[in-house]
Amino acid sequence: VTGGLLDEPVARAWAHGAQRALDAARERIDAVNVFPVADADTGTNTLLTVRGAADALDALPDGSGDDAALAALARGALLAARGSSGIILSRYLGALAGAARDGADLPTALATAAAGAREAVPDPQDGTMLTMAAVVAEAVRAGGAAVPSGEGPGVPGDRAVPGAEAADRSAAVLAAALDVGRGALDRVSAAHPVLREARVVDSGACALLVVLDALAVALATAGRPAAPTAGTIAGPIAAPSAPQVDLDWLPAAPRPSGDRACGVPITPGAVEVMAVLPGSALPDLADRLHGLGDAVAVVAGVDADGGPVRH
């Protein structure tokens, strides 16, 4: 990493690594999707959202710069977002990218992302990807604080460390925090009554952990190209011993059958409405839509021309 937390090569590697990982994890994540709507599409929706970020970066000429790459990542995710999980993830990615552009360290960027994702939902629910975002952010903060000054993210001295070394340290702290998140997944999910009754983990939390694992790999390898390893999903890797996105922890739940998903009735006759609206004078849009739908999320961003939009 040549500049701050995320430079252009790492942003590109992260987006593509997350896309590959979610593509491989999609069916397992879909299978445990019972909240907010039991429609078995969280894995698919988060994959499409991340694919939009990767496509936006592909459309950007190499060497466009860190700020342009981060803006493209955020905008691509926003405009491609599908479903409530995709909208929330797009807001998370946008807030993280924005914090990175502003020079934030890893703990600050993840805390900003967690707060931004929660703000996207008019009725935030604990026990979901929103809670997992906060758990990982806190674990990163605690992990960074435990590293001696100048030797880890979250401390002023890290800004003086050469970029690749700082990225390695950020990757190590994030990887450790993701271990905490995976270890807390059952407990976090059990905090939500629907998930507790269905005895499943939250699908959105699973997707977020996969996306952040891809970030840890991208940071650890500074955006270098990858080669796959059996049983894993390749991230941006240059050596056989380099880290991979591990999906073995994901639940192996059965696909929905008939009218039930993990024992929860599949919502009948549901209609999903997605819209990208120009303009920013819509401060009460989420509240007004909340009274009309089961799962509402509204995210603000900018279009390709820099104009304000809401999705």
Spans of features found by a protein language model:
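N-terminal loops that bind phosphate or other acidic moieties
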Residues: 1-311
